[in-house]
Amino acid sequence: MQPPIPAPLKHVSRTPATPAVAKALTRLQCWPGEQRVAVGLSGGVDSSLSAALLVEAGWQVEGLTLWLMSGKGACCSDGLIDAAGICEQLKIPHHVVDSRATFQAEIVDQLVQGYQQGVTPLPCSRCNRSVKFAEMLSWAKKELQLHRVATGHYARIRHREDPEPQQALPGDSIGRHQLLRGLDQNKDQSYFLYDLSQDVLAKVIFPLGELTKAETRQEAERYGLRTAKKEESQDLCLADHYGSMKAFLDNYLPARQGEIVLQDGKVVGEHDGIEHFTIGQRKGLGVAWREPLHVVQLDAAANRVIVAPRAEAGRDNCVVGAVNWISMAPPSTTINVEVQVRYRSGPVAAQLTPIEATAEDIAADRPHRCRLTFNEKQFSITPGQAAVFYAADTVLGGGLIQQVNTASS
């Protein structure tokens, strides 16, 4: 299907809509070195405005869209059409990279395997590391001789060559690029970017890091971008593609009935597959009990969902493996950090203690592991999800939750 002919780009006043946009443009205009970049375009307003800002700042811009899934779905049809239309409006080339095989192997297959093992995987951070940035940087270098990419993520990078001073961190961070939260607290996506490498951070630009979503919409309308009012996806791209996450899981995993039990083994209900549950879940359990119950464990070996009242559901500490220290060197002693254990959860205080890595982590060249001891009990610590460590706005690092414990564990 050919994209419709887009409306031409509106003439844009040299007076940006907000001071934050003016600051973003100034930063892009003063960027050191060669100003050539490939912009990852998903077909949404965020990546569209990122490309527009770079064009206005005088960069030579190439649009790049990854084709991730086959078949009919918003992310592989509407997204491609809108991305092509934006490139027409901005008068920049548009390239589509077939990354379906990589996405299937690195994301879909790993996601299914994780659910089979009773964990709740976090595909977005893995996708950023193993698919999106890896594929864009590799293709742009090979085909376009470009060494920088930009995306519409709400996050910031303090490059080591930037004039502003770097934040003092609890460990060695001299000479490192630092990943920071986006200034819009409601849209900050640094949680999903903790697993990028220093080499990738050196080559990445986030034009929207200091903008709010409202400012992005306002500026996109000022440009007349066709995506300015496009609705934002509220779910994983896989859920959008299949209609729901349940439909995706049903497509790959046959229903397997099992028991819902209390921590003492008492059976209180049945389920059609542990993959449909997650730690901390309270609604939709299908269990009638004298008080609300929360999922506290998924036992893949026994095909059981283990539940408990809230008073018994809190956890004191967890083990985090495959840790990537993105903005600082690995610490050798216990440090105080703020930890985010879910994308939409706020940071909580904890002590981070380095511990010996597993043979599996070492074999995967991810030799860093730690224990997090929380100042207060937590109720949604989920194996498979990421625990990301912060010092104020700076991402120190993060890893995957492997084991959740009580104080006596």
Swiss-Prot record:
Keywords: ATP-binding, Cytoplasm, Disulfide bond, Nucleotide-binding, RNA-binding, Transferase, tRNA processing, tRNA-binding. Pfam families: tRNA_Me_trans, tRNA_Me_trans_C, tRNA_Me_trans_M. Its main location: cytoplasm. GO terms for molecular function: ATP binding; tRNA binding; tRNA-uridine 2-sulfurtransferase activity. The keyword Amino-acid biosynthesis does not apply. The record marks H153, Q385 as: Interaction with tRNA. Catalyzes the 2-thiolation of uridine at the wobble position (U34) of tRNA, leading to the formation of s(2)U34. This is tRNA-specific 2-thiouridylase MnmA. It comes from Prochlorococcus marinus (strain MIT 9313). The gene is mnmA.
